[in-house]
């Protein structure tokens, strides 16, 4: 088939003031090719004709033509002319509709999936929606030093080496592991060397790997009641039988744990989730003795331990362990920002080779750039300063919440004065249902979570989880006011008598 030619002069849009001439010409020609005004097989005007028509240097036009060739829009050689390709790059990037339709039809047939896939339940965490009172588990993201973080990021990019671009060991970037080991040793009394630290996308990934390594179908795993649902989901997905033990003011009630047959126990001793209590030293020693006697391993999730407002810090459970039976996990998502997706696990030496193997088969390693930036953020002292600053701010916000709640909610909801963390708990007057109260609060743009979302039983049936860290004092006051209106409406609806002052 003979090549098509055109005798028509092109009609191109005006060149924007700040756009280079070659870029303007490339964009204009590409647009006309995609729109069909320059159809497949047609010959473009010569570089001389375009130069004469638009008053451009031929070198500028040649540059634009070369870019069109490089991206697959035209073909040709000097002297033979330049022609629009019959198959454009956009066509290569999209599947035709008929093929899409066949794929959808095939997907409608039942698929054979593994036992894991049938057992696993979607864990979405906490919804990614705008912050409002009293959404729990959120730090004050507006106070994170974004400018400083960006500056360190750009510096790391300028200095990044070829070796760093290739990645790092499965367990993470060694300088970051060294910084984490030093930090948890100093602040939490954790006993470890850097080689025991694994950098992960978060504690949730650590739970998944621990479940894969330690839990067989039918094994018994113990958790606190109430408990972080992501942990329960990780263990159940691998076929674990979950045993729940209650929590009192000193922590998990060890007497409720089975005497034998438990493979693993998951606890949050530094700041029980979601109740907020701190496990006493005596209870920690009792739990360690039980674990040794029953040959169980312990997964210690030390989330939120950085933000302690009263009382002396209690050393991590791992620091009291002299038998190598505790896996210690921490995260930067609440200390810095959730999207960072970096956490860590301190692994007992005997488990380290198997953990490294499992990690290498999972995500290879955590994102390298984020590890580099976080390493510098810690080394330069910004991490410690940020924690100290935010601890003061969060303590003030907790005080505002307690004072406002005492004045406005005292007869309907008693809020606990927690020693640490980003949220607290509130206990409803008898007769008001927590689920109904949460639904009523939501109609007034207030988020409170019923504790029943974290476990069964009457002991937590009247409890609500209430976040405060992400809210300015004025937002806390407004939230308490709206919550009071919602709870008063529930009191009237359920005809609960007013408490006398």
Predicted regions and their residues:
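N-terminal basic, amphipathic alpha-helical segments
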Residues: 1-156, 350, 356, 360-367, ...
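Short glycine-rich anion-binding loops that position phosphate/pyrophosphate groups of nucleotides
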Residues: 139, 269-273, 334
